[in-house]
Amino acid sequence: MNKNDFKDFQNYLIDKKHFSSNTVNSYERDLRKLFIYLDSNGYDCDDIRSWLTEVCINNYMEYLRDNKYSAATLARTVSTVHVYSEYLFDKNIIKDKPQIDIKITKDAEHDLVIFTRYEIAQILDIDTLTLNDFRDKAIFELSYSIGIKPTECINLEMKDVNLEIGYIKYRKQDSYRTVALNTESIEAIRNYLDALKKHKVPISEESKLFLNHDGEGISRQGYWKIFKKRQKELELTKELNTMNFRNSLAVHLLEDNVPIQDVQEILGLKNIHSLKSYIKSLKKTKAIKRMFSNHPRKAMK
């Protein structure tokens, strides 16, 4: 794959998939890493059918595991391979989209980090003293309302929010999603918008919803720092990041017996299979609660 091929793949990720620049760079790095592996193991990278196979890709995954790559890297590599296959198919470089079952073995899996409802309440309880406080409060409430992902959140524009009816519309890959908001997130966003007006921040319908101190849309790094700052303020032992926050919402919805299909819709998941890890975490939590509720020590009091 030459320089022009990589550029074409990058353009595909941006124009067709609407990925952020950070995601595009990650996919390109993963693909280059794969090609280095293929070349060092005697594969001809230009002969796509020789290596875009279930056996070869799973051998590569085993190589990554042996070299202690994280579960997150393995999962992203799986996504990269699938998206690259779609790209090759869409560009008619291959005639059939390969059906590759990529296996991530259990030793690469890890338990989800789930915040309790009390911890979530603490995180959401932000003293709104400054403009950034109002912004951060709105971001956390929105994240816990619908489990919105970082790229989706930072790309929101003022015109994407309808607080009268109570919904937001945002781009998800090559389509738009319209999602209803809960009362708390509507109130938090409305208070944030009022604070923007009070501070005379110039905004328009096309302005980004969440702004930095320069009045520009916050970056992915800035978004990440908001979560790190809150973790430090509360001295949380669990890592507070966007994924753990989203995972917590999913498990709490399932705990409240929200139908699986509704949880899938709220989180914007493509299929119910994506909920497997959440259901597994919920079962583990319930098992622990049962164990302690029936523990013999309780009868000794």
Per-region residue spans from a language model:
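Conserved catalytic core of the tyrosine transesterase superfamily
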Residues: 1-301
